Amino acid sequence: LVSQVESRWGKIDALINGAGPYHRVNLFDETPAGWREMFEGNLHPIFYLGQAVAPGMKARKQGRIINFSMANADQMVAQPEVTGHYIAKAGVLILTRTLAKLLAPYGITVNAISPGFIDSGSAPPDELAGVVKRIPAGYIGSVGDTVAAVRYLLSEEARYVNGANLHLSGGWGI
């Protein structure tokens, strides 16, 4: 995939790892396939894509990698209904910091964004109304809030920000 992108458009300046499956199931009801899906969809692509884009970024001595985790993944609190997803997203944070340390000498920054509740239009309004009560800021984040965080980490203003985990949660999960 990386070589196809590079051959068609040239260089890769930034890698944003934002997609990944999510499901809510009690740990004791989790299936081997569901467990595997959480790691194969949330953690493994970040490893493989980071490994694939690193040589080109290192050669140019510049690049940005942004990985999406989840709010409170750094808390190490039991999450019985989303255990596989939670462990994979905690792994994203460890991988982010490791890549940041390895790639910093080459002018490459690697950071994480850990969103809490973001209204992307897919959640039922009644569910969002219940959630907003748990957010200290008093409102649910927007897709625009997420875009602003990504834009910042891609900018020159963030050139010294490396290995960070930017909580995008209105204070929820901290």
Q: What kind of region is each of these model predictions?
A:
Residues 50-51, 97:
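A short, exposed helix-loop element centered on a Lys and neighboring polar residues
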Residues 142-168, 173:
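C-terminal substrate-recognition "lid" of short-chain dehydrogenase/reductases
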Residues 12, 26-27, 34-39, 123, ...:
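Substrate-binding pocket helix/loop in short-chain dehydrogenase/reductase
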Residues 18-23, 171:
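Conserved NAD(P)H cofactor-binding loop of Rossmann-fold oxidoreductase domains
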Residues 66-91, 96-105:
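Catalytic loop of short-chain dehydrogenase/reductase
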Residues 104, 109, 161-163:
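Short, small/polar-rich loop/turn modules that mediate ligand/substrate recognition or access, typified
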Residues 55, 101-102, 159:
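Alpha-helical segment proximal to the catalytic Tyr-Lys
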